[in-house]
Structures are given as structure tokens and as C-alpha cells.
From Swiss-Prot:
Family per similarity comment: Belongs to the MTFR1 family.
Annotated organism of origin: Mus musculus
Chain intervals for the UniProt region annotation (Disordered): 95-135, 166-235, 283-312
Compositionally biased tracts (Polar residues): 116-127, 166-181
Protein name (Swiss-Prot/TrEMBL): Mitochondrial fission regulator 1
Positions with biased composition (Basic and acidic residues): 95-106, 288-298
Function: May play a role in mitochondrial aerobic respiration. May also regulate mitochondrial organization and fission.
Annotated keywords: Coiled coil, Mitochondrion, Phosphoprotein, Transit peptide
GO biological process: aerobic respiration; mitochondrial fission; mitochondrion organization
GO cellular component: a single term: cytosol
Region called Necessary and sufficient to promote mitochondrial fission, residue ranges: 178-299
Ranges of Pro residues composition bias in the record: 183-196
Transit peptide: 1-48
Length: 328
């Protein structure tokens, strides 16, 4: 079955004019032999569809009745004319729209060319409109009036507080019969300063608010820096940064403080002495039994210990080792 399919594919490729090796084993990432579809498309005689062509024209070269036959190619200006035509649904060319003679009763209208809608912001900044400048001036006036009212209210509150503080000690000294004199009303606040007549167009209400907020923050920082701060904890990094440059001096010790060094001893002799001390009682007990020295009654009557060196079996290796060690 696979051989039949392979034969069929080879015959089909030969009819088209493509070799099977160039299709399967060609590693060329470009050209007509990149894929089977491109190879078939190059060999087949297909009629390409005509492409739509647009012509970019400037506003100065508008349609004129003198050369009505020319400029028949559709351009992007036709798209704008079609968009402005709200009454009719059919699409027409700019030449057909402009060929209509204008009515005598209609006033001449001067339309500006259709603007191209782009997703990028315009680099040229437009000048602020007079309505916008008037709105910003009104906002500035309102903000300044509110700030003046706040300042006047603060001044009145401060005066009331000072009068209450002055009257509180004097009220205790007066008798109950005497009536407390009512403080006169505070004087009216001073009128707000006149606003400048000429305001720069670029300044707005938000910019003014930001500037005054920055001034208040800077004033608060200056007050905070005026008071002396408490000394903080010392920084250990600053203390330890000069540790490498510290030099130590040598100090002589007294003979009493110096500990005597142990003398160099032979390790074999030290081990032999320890073994002799450990197994001395055993040799003594064996010598007494061999000599026939009677044990005391207290030792004979006493019960043997459950655990101890007597449980171990005696061998002659340890005895020979002790005898071979030279006496120090």
C-alpha cells in the first residue's frame, strides 16, 4: 500500500514538473521550492486579481471643470467625500460629485479638505481657545477667593481663642454679681488683594494648585529643619570602616602569667604506664593465689560482684605485652 502511494506521488510530481528529492530534502528557506504550494502555484497559470490603486492628491489640485476627464483615478479624497455624503448610499467618484453645477440660490460654502484620521498625536500643539482661557481665569478667581475666605476665618478663630484665654483668668476673680462684659465683634476681614489683570495663557488652575502645595511643603520642611534633632544611634558601619588601619602593639607578660609548657614525653612510655596502672591489681591478685596467701574472711564471705573485670577471660596476650614494654 505504501509503495503504491509513493508511486502515485512520484507520478504526480513528475507530471507537475517537480522532483521528489527537491520537495522533501531541500533545505532552502527561500525561492519557489520553499514549499509544495509555492511550487504548484508557479507552474499553474493562474490569473491574478487586479489590485486597487489609490492616488494621494493635495488640496491645491482640486477637480476643475477645465480638465474633467483627467484625474479619474480614485484617491483618498474620494473616501472623505463619500463619508460626508449622508443623504445618498451609493459610492461615487469625486469627479461625479463635483460635476454638478451649484445652485444660484445656495451661498458659496468653503469646505476645508477632509482631514486624515491618524492614530498618532499631532506634533504641532494648537493654541488654547479663548473659551478655555476664560474658564481658567474664572477657576483662578474662585480659588483665590476661597483661599482669602479661609485666611479670614483662621484670623477670626485665632482672635476668639485669644479673647477666651484672656477672659478665663479674669472671670475667677470677679464676683458673681458683676456681669461679664461681652467682647466686641471682631473687625471685618480685609478685602482680598486685587487679581493681576494680565494672566499667562499657559498657566491653569491645576498648575497654580501644585505650585502652592509645593510652597507649603517647602515651608513645613524648613520648620522641621529649624528644630535640632535628637542624636540617633551611631552607625556601626562608620565605626568599623577603619578597623583595617588599626595597628596592635606587643606587650610583654610577666613570668607569673606565662604558663609552663609541658615537656615532650614519649607516647609509648605514657601508654605503657597507663596500662601498668590499670592491670596492676590483676597481677597482684594472681600472685597471691599462686603463693597460697589466704584471703581474709570478710573477702571470702562477701558475694562476688556481678559486673567487673573478673567476668573477662584471662589470656596471655596482655601479660606478654606488658613484659615486652621496656621500663621507663
Amino acid at each position: 500500500m505504501l509503495g503504491w502511494i509513493k508511486c502515485l506521488m512520484r507520478m504526480w510530481f513528475q507530471r507537475v514538473g517537480v522532483s521528489m528529492q527537491s520537495v522533501l530534502w531541500s533545505g532552502k528557506p527561500y525561492g519557489s521550492s520553499r514549499s509544495i504550494v509555492r511550487k504548484i502555484g508557479t507552474n499553474l497559470s493562474l490569473i491574478q486579481c487586479p489590485r486597487v490603486q489609490f492616488q494621494l492628491t493635495s488640496h491645491a489640485t482640486e477637480w476643475s471643470p477645465a480638465h474633467s476627464g483627467e484625474d479619474a483615478v480614485a484617491s483618498f479624497a474620494d473616501v472623505g467625500l463619500v463619508a460626508t455624503e449622508e443623504g445618498e448610499c451609493s459610492i461615487r467618484l469625486r469627479a461625479e460629485v463635483s460635476s454638478k453645477p451649484p445652485h444660484e440660490d445656495d451661498p458659496p460654502c468653503f469646505e476645508k479638505p477632509p482631514s486624515r484620521h491618524t492614530s498618532f498625536p499631532s506634533l504641532s500643539q494648537d493654541k488654547p481657545s479663548p473659551e478655555r482661557t476664560l474658564a481658567s481665569e474664572e477657576a483662578l478667581q474662585k480659588i483665590s477667593a476661597l483661599e482669602n475666605e479661609l485666611a479670614a476665618l483662621r484670623a477670626q478663630i485665632a482672635k476668639i481663642v485669644t479673647l477666651q484665654e484672656q477672659q478665663s483668668p479674669s472671670a475667677g476673680c470677679l464676683d458673681s454679681s458683676t456681669s461679664v462684659t461681652v467682647a466686641p465683634p471682631p473687625p471685618p476681614p480685609p478685602p482680598p488683594p486685587p487679581l493681576p489683570l494680565v494672566l499667562h495663557q499657559s498657566t491653569s488652575a491645576l498648575d497654580l494648585i501644585k505650585e502652592r502645595r509645593e510652597q507649603r511643603l517647602s515651608a513645613g520642611k524648613t520648620l522641621a529643619t529649624g528644630h535640632p534633632k535628637k542624636p540617633d544611634m551611631p552607625n556601626m558601619l562608620e565605626i568599623l570602616k577603619d578597623m583595617n588601619s588599626v595597628k596592635l602593639r606587643s606587650v610583654k607578660r610577666s613570668e607569673k602569667d606565662v604558663k609552663p609548657r609541658p615537656a615532650d614525653t614519649d607516647h609509648a612510655a605514657f601508654i605503657a604506664e597507663a596500662l601498668k596502672k590499670k592491670f596492676a591489681y590483676r597481677h597482684n591478685s594472681q600472685g597471691e593465689t599462686e603463693r597460697g596467701i589466704p584471703k581474709p574472711e570478710s573477702e571470702a564471705t562477701s558475694e562476688p560482684a556481678l559486673f567487673g573485670p573478673h567476668i573477662l577471660k584471662s589470656t596471655g596476650k596482655m601479660k606478654a605485652l606488658i613484659e615486652n614494654v621496656p621500663d621507663s
